[in-house]
């Protein structure tokens, strides 16, 4: 069974620090998340942290776009060796009511200097996480909010700016999605609120199964031994928790609960030095803070 080796708070300066991601780039750690006054309040900005060892963290950059609430930043490395950020960009009226959104992307050569957030796709889209494979970026865009029907469109891109439609995920309540690839080219999708999908090139036809548990903020990775490990928010008898799950292409089994509670989830996952490193956010210690956990599998 997985064992929690360590966990520590690495950031808590804003009233609400949430929606994390984690990556290794140029032999350093990089962690991103949203800073704001609250979970659903406008005015979010994106903070980029960096660390050489994962022990001491420092701020590398802050991304801001006037009048836009930047949300759910996710990191990837482009084929030409740059860091890429994909974010949701939401607009609110003067009373703070949600109006519309569109995805934003930003790029950096060094993690410190970033291009201005650039809008991609059309209004109502939200590219939630980008995964690169064989020189192309893939992402599922979620559409629809509130009482509107939700839809999920799979896109690909060669540059992260111009996106080509591939297929629609016709699932009830389809939302946040992480995509990964197996060595034979099969694509696997972990989809909120609780689906696992598989497809082979050209990724137009999909097979889905439902998971036993509902998943919020889904992420997963494939380890060198071929095993799949997932994470997300699990609603337990004691309230929401961030969990690590043993995963296959047809199952998702929570096996470890991280120290967490309340407003929590959205883990970044990296396999490094024979440990699973996980960034996540939680409000179990007062305030909503960013944490880094190391898990031995």
What are these regions (language model features)?
Residues 1-18, 23-70, 77-265, 270-297:
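Beta-rich carbohydrate-recognition and catalytic domains
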């Amino acid at each position: 069974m997985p064992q929690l080796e360590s966990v520590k708070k690495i950031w808590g300066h804003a009233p609400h620090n949430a929606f994390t991601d984690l990556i290794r780039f140029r032999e350093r750690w990089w962690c991103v998340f949203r800073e704001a006054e609250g979970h659903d309040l406008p005015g979010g900005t994106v903070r980029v942290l960096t660390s050489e060892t994962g022990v001491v963290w420092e701020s590398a950059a802050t991304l801001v776009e006037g009048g836009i609430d930047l949300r759910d930043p996710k990191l990837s490395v482009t084929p030409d060796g740059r860091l890429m950020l994909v974010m949701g960009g939401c607009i609110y009226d003067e009373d703070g009511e949600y109006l519309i959104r569109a995805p934003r992307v930003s790029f950096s050569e060094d993690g410190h200097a970033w291009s201005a957030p650039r809008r991609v796709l059309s209004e109502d889209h939200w590219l939630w996480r980008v995964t690169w494979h064989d020189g192309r970026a893939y992402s599922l865009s979620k559409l629809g909010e509130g009482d509107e029907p939700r839809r999920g469109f799979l896109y690909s891109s060669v540059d992260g700016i111009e996106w080509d439609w591939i297929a629609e995920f016709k699932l009830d309540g389809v939302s946040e999605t992480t995509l990964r690839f197996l060595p034979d080219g099969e694509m696997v999708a972990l989809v909120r609120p609780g689906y696992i999908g598989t497809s082979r090139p050209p990724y137009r036809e999909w097979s889905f199964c439902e998971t036993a548990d509902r998943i919020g903020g889904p992420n997963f990775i494939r380890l060198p031994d071929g095993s799949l490990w997932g994470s997300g928010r699990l609603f337990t008898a004691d309230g929401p928790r961030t969990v690590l799950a043993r995963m296959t292409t047809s199952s998702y089994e929570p096996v470890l609960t991280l120290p967490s509670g309340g407003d929590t989830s959205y883990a970044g996952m990296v396999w490094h030095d024979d440990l699973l490193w996980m960034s996540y956010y939680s409000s179990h210690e007062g305030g909503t803070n960013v944490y880094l956990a190391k898990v031995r599998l």
